[in-house]
Every structure is written in structure tokens, then in C-alpha cells.
Amino acid sequence: MLGHNIYEEDDAFNPFADSVSPLNPPKTDQEPSAEGVEEESPNVQASPPKTHIYTSPRKRSVNLKSLPFETLTLDSAPLGPLQFSDAPSMAPENNRLEVGLNTKINPLKGSSPALNADFSANKPWISEVNSFSPSPIGATENPTIPNSEQTVDTLDAASSSAPNFTHTVSSASSQKQGSTSLTDTENQKAHPAAAPQSLTPFYIQVHDPHTVKEITKSHTVYSVSTRLEEHNQPSVSNVTVQRRYNDFAFLYQLLSNNHPGCIIPPIPEKQVVGRFDDEFIEQRRAALEVMLRKISAHPVLRDDYSFKLFLEAETFDPRMTHRTTLIESSSSPLRSGPSTSGLLDSFTSAFHTSGSSKFSEQDPILIEAKDTLDSLETQLKSVYHALLLSIDQRIQFASAIHDFGEAVGNLSLVDLEPTLSSKFDGLSQLQVELRFVQERKVAQDNLTLGTTLEEYIRYVESAKNAFTTRQKLWQTWQSSVQAVSRAKTQLEKCKKQAKSQQKSLPYLEEQYEKYRAKAADLEKEFSESTTLLKRDLSSLTTSRVDDLKASVETWLESAIESQKEIIERWESFLDQ
């Protein structure tokens, strides 16, 4: 720890004790018990954190190749220590959902075998914290749809008004039937959920990036190597495929559509200027590798068909990977029989107007989580903006030191007293050394705090995207409920007609049952997406805050070491 290796005289030193921010809340006298902390009263409104207006500056590119990396003293990097060691795994001890930033973190380190040397390409393996080791949350009962006439009345009544969500996201049908549903607190006490086991990531490596030049435009291709022993193959074998950046972006979009409410590990941002620089390509390669490993560690995403196809297929064609999801299948009318003179046109069109239903979040846990994400994103961007300004000023300071050293060196060449000329020459050499110290500090800031903040911001944006996909699923569900209501109206109207005019009755009954089953499936999937979103939010809070704390400590240690080195060099110069 920082306090042990630098401030040995004060064991209780804490560099973050006096700072109060969303990332470091003030401590309380009482420690949370192992049984969990009682939920706060919903009537008590916490004051929102102070926000700042953020304007994105131009990110300065630092040529890391010109810096003497052999002198870097980083103990860790934002993506993990640069080493040929094992990947750590997370086993959080939280026993309930904690969306806020005051989650207690105590990860347990694990290990996994090293990568196969066949495709290591003599590059260090970048370890990363498994941000998707899910924390247990209270069990939530999925409402059931009984196949009775009561369900028809329920869906008909639900079409006129949106369902009122409770903590357990109970559906409109279960509320209208008067079925008992547990709140979050009661449900957690009645059905305590067992902690899911932490999943080991697949052995994935992104390596050998090379630029493919074309007539119109060029792009970079990456080799993705995977060991198939995690896929229950009879024998261990390595599969290497070629993927470009657009393939990774398309994989992210597929996973987002296939799993509403799931927080997908974010993809690095697109860049137009300097995208073929060696430094930028290496940073993107490392970020893409971490993205794939975190997807493989997610208990839901690792078994996705599109993800397996991305790792194993020779070509990643959108036409091959496209599979109709439940939302897409509900967006088109179910026509399995002949046309019935437009009787179904009045309610099948409801599937194409999913945006007509206005979504209003009623779950207090998700409302608080959404507000926390908005505030957190603003504060993270503010800190990242300030860090970039600090880096820019340090680069200018290093340039000024270099100019001063050259001026003093030229002064030492003048025919002066020999002792004075020697002093000027030593001062000139000292300024050159101090310039390298400042440039090395710039590299350390980028590798530690800068990259971690940027990745954290992308994770927050991915979490907000999970809220959006869940909202689209809710709108599709409400459209299906309206379609069931209209189908029931048409069916009852046909039953009231004369026997000779009821030729379309069997077809209407069949279509009505299909629409009702589809509405039940959408209701169940919406409940599952809510549970998945809460679990991923808890895991995100635990893992990302832990990474940020580690990066801040590493950044502070590097700053102290840089100041010590500067003082030692000045003392050596004075002793000459």
C-alpha cells in the first residue's frame, strides 16, 4: 500500500482522507454488517453532487516511443500490470445490490493459466479485472401468464394504461389479477439468491495488427486467437481469425440488441486523425483485447451465438450473424393463414408503432442508478478534462526546461572562469535530465489515470445504452398488449355475427392465441432484462470503482517518485 512503502512513520496515513467526492464518500463510524445494510427511506432525498460544465479539449498525443520506458516505475497500468502473469478474477463479497458509489470492495485475487505461446508474439499479456463477476441481488419472481380468460381481460385493461412498476417490476397482468408480489426487501428475505460463481475469461489474444491499404481507403486488421477448450471441445485447439475495427463495433451492436438491459463491455472510440500511428494502434489493440475477455467473463454474453461466431468463423458477415430477436419478431405481424378482408390490419399495425407508448421508470432503484450515472459521467468528464489540461501544461513545461538547458549550455561555451563554466555545463545537463523526468510523468499520467478515466466514461455510456435497450423492449411489450386487445375485439365481434359469416373465426382465434403468447414472452423478457440490468450495475460499481482507486493510488505514487527524483538530482548538482 501507499502508506506502507512511503510514509512508514504514519501507519494511518490515507491520501484520500480529506477529499470528499462521488468517488470517495465520507466515512461513517458504523461499519456495515455481513448481513447487509438496511435500505434507506425513499423519502430522504440525497443532495445531488456538484456538477461542472464539460467541454472536450483536443486530446494531445504523446509519442511514447521517444521516452525511456526502461526508467518507468509503474507498479500497475490501467489495463493491468504489463507482465506474463495470470489474469486476476473477481469474487465480490457483496450480499445485496449497491448502486451507489459507497460500495465496499474487497476483491479476491485468482489466477488462470498463461496464454499459449503459439500466438503470444512476444507481447506482454495485459491482465484486467473481471468487471462482470456478478454480485448477488435479491431474487425476483417472474410473473406468470395463466392461460385463462382472466389473462385476456388483464391484457385488455393493460392496453389502456401503462403498468405500474414495483420494486420487483411486476407486470400489468399480475397486478390486475390481484396476485401477490413481493417487494425487493421482502423478496430478498424470502428467497436469498446464491452468489453466482466468478467465470474465468476465455484465452483470447488480439495481436499482430497490420494495415491493409486499398485504393479508396485503408484499414487495420487484427488477429484474434482463442483457445477452444472453454467451448467444451474434445481437444484443445487454437483458432485464429482476422477482424477489423468495424467487426468489433458490429459485435457490440449485436450483443446490445440480443440482450436488452445488459451492460456490454465498451468498444474503444473511433478516431480519424492519427489512426495509423503505431502508438494509437497498440492502445486500440490492448483495449479490444480487454473488451473480448470481459465479454467472455460475462455469464450471459459468453454463450451468445454472435460472440462465438466472432471468435471462430473465418468471416464475420452481418448476414450470417443476424438472427431475429424477440423484439424484431414482435415488430412484424404473425400471418400464418389467409387474409381475412382486413380484419387483422387494425391491430397488427400496432407492432409498428412501438414508439407511441411513453416509458416512465417507476423502479426506485433504477431511478437512483440512472441519476447516479448522469452525475458520475459529468464528474468523470470534468476530471478527465482537467487531467488533459495538466498534461498539456506539463508538456509545455518540459519544453521550457529544454530551452533553458540549451541556453545555459551555450553560456558555458563562453570563455569564462573554468569553475563557473563547469557549473553552467552541469546545470545544462541537469535541465536535460529534468526534461526527461517531466516527459516520463506525462506518459505515466496517460497510462494510469488518463486511460482509466476514459474507459470508465465509456462504461458509463454503455450502461446508459443498457437503459435504452430495456426501454425499447418495454415499448415493444406495450405494443403487443395493445395488439392483443384489438385482436380480442375483432374476435368478439366475429362471434356475434351469424353462423354463416363466421368463416374467419378459427383463424382469428389462432392469431389471438399467438399474439397473447407473444405478449407473455415479452413480459417475461422485460422482467429478466430488469434483473440483468440491476446485477450488471452492481458489478460495474464494484469493479470500476476498484480500478479507479487503484489507478489513483498508482498515479499518486508515481507523482511522489518523480518529485523525489527531481530533489535527488538537484541535491547531487549542489554537492558537485
Curated annotation (Swiss-Prot):
It is a peripheral membrane protein. A 1,2-diacyl-sn-glycero-3-phospho-(1D-myo-inositol-3-phosphate) binds at R244, K270, R284. PROSITE patterns: PX (PS50195). Residues 200-317 form the PX domain. The modification Phosphothreonine is found at T55. Its main location: cytoplasm. It holds the Pfam family PX. InterPro entries: AH/BAR_dom_sf, BAR_Vps5, PX_dom, PX_dom_sf, PX_Vps5, Vps5_C. The keyword Manganese does not apply. Signal peptide: none annotated. Residues 170-181 have a biased composition (Low complexity). Required for efficient sporulation target of PtdIns(3)P in vesicle transport required for onset of the forespore membrane formation. Plays a role in vesicular protein sorting. Required for the endosome-to-Golgi retrieval of the vacuolar protein sorting receptor pep1/vps10. Component of the membrane-associated retromer complex which is essential in endosome-to-Golgi retrograde transport. The vps29-vps26-vps35 subcomplex may be involved in cargo selection. Component of the retromer complex which consists of vps29, vps26, vps35, vps5 and vps17. This is Vacuolar protein sorting-associated protein vps5. The lineage of its organism: Eukaryota, Fungi, Dikarya, Ascomycota, Taphrinomycotina. The gene is vps5.
